[in-house]
Amino acid sequence: ASYSSQKNPDYIQIAKGKSAKNFSDEDLKNIFNVAEKARLTLTNRVQLKTPDADLNNFGANLAVAADGIWESPTFLHGAIAWRMRLNAWRGAYTADALSWHDRAKEHFESYANSQVLKPDFAPVEMDTMRHLARHEEKMGTSVFASGYISRNPNDTTKPHHYDMNLVFFDQLFSHFKYTGDKEFLKKMWPTMVRHMDWEKRNFKRGDLYDAYAAIWASDALQYSGGKVTHTSAYNYRANREMAKLAKIIGENPQPYEQEADAILKAMKNELWIKNKGYFAEYKDALGNQIVHDKPGIWSIYHVSDAFILNEFEDYQNLQYINNHTPKIPITVKGADNKNYFTLATTNWQPYDWSINNVALAENLQTALAYWQAGRTEDAYQLWKGNLIESMYYGISPGNFEQLSHYDAFRGELYRDFADPIGVASRTLTEGLFGVYPNLLENKISIRPGFPKDWNSAELKLPDWDYQFKRTSKKTEYLFKSKYQNPVALEMQIPVNYSNIKSVKVNGKKVEWKIKPNSILQPIIQFETPKGKDFKIEINYLGEELINEQTDYVNYISESLQLNFDSKKKIKNIYDPQGLIKNSPPPEGWIRPKGEDGVVNHKFELNPQERKGTFFLQVEQNGTTWWQPVNVDIHFPLETKWANKKLQIQSKSSNPINGKLNINGLNKTFTIQKNQSTSIEIPINYLSKGTNSIELEYNGIKQNIEITDWEIENQGEFNNISLASKYNEKVTEIFNQKYLSPRLKVTTLQLPWQGIGNWCYPLITAQIDDIGLMNKRKNGKVDFLEIPFLIDKTDKNVAFVSQWDNYPDSIEIPLTGKGKKIYFLMAGSTNPMQSQIVNGKITVQYVDGSTSELELKNPTNWWPIEQDLFDDNFAFEIPDDKIPYRVKLKTGELYKGGTLSKYSSIKGFTDRQIDGGAATILDLPIDPNKELKSIKLTAVSNDVIIGMMSATVLK
């Protein structure tokens, strides 16, 4: 079709049903013109100009979306889907960020009128109708008492199962900074005090806080009374802000200061993983009090948003995302590849709603966290990629989606969802332009977050205009404040030159300094006099700084060689994670030896496979800053088992002479640098399944495993009778009540049947073992040519658990020797126990030594009721570790994840196995040692670990 412009447009009316009246062309023209004027007023509210053409409609687009989620008196949960009232999540941040302070105030006031005032205190009543998974949803109980904000404005009568208070009051604290409205602060103070008391009463655990559905991604998150990073961060910020606000209006700040200090200290002591440099997801309250060390991205960015950490810690904490969070490439046929990617929120399994998703708001707030940590390039790359994916590549042009097309289970969802609109607003003003108003003190902090290759940018809002221009030797910032009172600007500006000639504000030179802990590049700090119009000029001398490499791969036994620009002197080292050999304790700086304190560019690192970061203080022309060094430490030999041969690839820069040992076989090998070799291993030294091999070279011992289930076993089998240890029939795993130990506190936790979550507390899975049991002959059943003995019928599994229903460990006596033990296992796990050890099988020898198999979700410990998922992105399991499974109902053997048909449990899983499945695992053992026993141990909470059979390969 072709079109040509018409000088006189035709106006068309589209109406549902019969029109109430006939409109003339003039009427329609007037209606259209009024609407068009309103549209232009709205789109011109946020005027953005950048060198990136993809972004220049972002401001107008954002204004329209933000207007779409407003319906007086409050912001809504979504513009189209979920167009309903809820006092959170992050949608309302858009109001103050985009200068709609009247809307913000109306939103806060109407929900303040929804705060419950009585009773002051009420008992904890966990909901027995929902199998103790959550608190009773009833007014007048512990959660729904004084301080709780109800879901509808101007209405205190409706309980709702989320702690939306936390984010609601976080938005309110920001509102006071954005407006400086002390009268409104005084009015809201009692409301805020009630909230703080409510949080402590319900969720305080020691000096930290539990999380009771307190963030968008909270469906199926349940911490069982544990100590949680993201809510502790929210409460830290709340107490810090309450202390500051108390001083302004003459209230007592001391209780809030003390609480904030206690939270900070406890977070550092209990949740900060010092040798890894990031915060854990949570710490269990019960059992082994495990620190769960694979956090969701919300644990990382909420810490940044509360400004808890110093610059070094903040950099390290964000590095967790770089090192460990699944990244999914954003690619579109025909589009230039700009290495855009999006993040999954976790790498946890099995999937359930909001446990492991690809969500726009989550990605945008992670980008904001990078900006808050001064990691501008990382911030921009993540931000831009996700905006492009949502606004250009998705189902609706200009959309702010909830979930992305790249979400493995749900795909793209919703148009203009409030949560990402609120976060997107903050990323524009606080992130890219770096503007943080604090009008309570008549100050504005500005920390520009522009990419290094931008030479201009401009943003106009009702509150302020901001223009950035850069030439070869000068950077200029024009800032026009439209606030009522004059303001001072607190500037922190990253610079690309080591020599600064002058800093001027409105033509007058001002004092400035380099921020002491500048990371990645020097950052200059200064404060302007109070005013409304500011012209800031930074004039440079000398050469532009060369960007240094930050990411290095290092091979064990080889020095790490840095290739910094020769003009930079390395003055100091800070090694908080203990990566460098003989590194002093990381409390203080390390003063290096050497002429003029200059450090060698070569470092010897501790010989351990890991990722980590240390920092080097560099100096050029008298200007100092800190350069991060991110290392990925590997063994220099990479191995692959293919065609019954072990292929070894050397990454070393030196020749390697080594020795291979497996089950008494010793073979020598030589590999030239960056070459590969193949070693044939006689079949009689191998066994079906997992084989442990030791490679010894250059003073290194590297233990590797090869897995091959097609190898023919050599040797006889010895079936172990577990009859005296069986304590349950496997079909009964979800047919009982797991009631203790549980804390008597308000929390979200596993329902008493041992499956499900707080959103779906009544679900179960029918386990049926008839096929497996009928397949036995003389008590034995063969899988993979391995005989498994199940020599009892009424009970056929030995369960262990941290629940009181079963012992936490069981010991099975053994005699003789063997080279491998095969196990038929069945039990439960859930996403809150993902990426950690759930249980252990320990083989004990007569001489006191042991061999151990860790049962880890998702690598080898899979839930009885469903299969886990492997897509190489958000759901990643090493292919050779995916176990064989046995369908209990039919006795059919299959490779995990490969069934052609799965059934579903509504709201819980679409990967259910009809009747459930057991898992075949194996553990190589020392063939030269006398066996004493097998010990089965439950390590993590919630789970049931079961052994149905054990077979020794002699």
Model-derived features: where do they sit?
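Acidic/polar, glycine-enriched structural segments that form the non-catalytic walls/loops
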Residues: 1-82, 117, 174-177, 182-184, ...
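Short strand-edge motifs at loop-to-beta-strand transitions and within beta-strands
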Residues: 522-524, 599-601, 667, 675-681
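Acidic/His metal-coordination segments adjacent to aromatic residues that form catalytic metal sites
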Residues: 137-158, 212-228, 403-411
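N-terminal/edge-of-domain interface segments
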Residues: 630-634, 686-954
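Non-catalytic C-terminal accessory modules of carbohydrate-active enzymes
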Residues: 365-578, 609-611
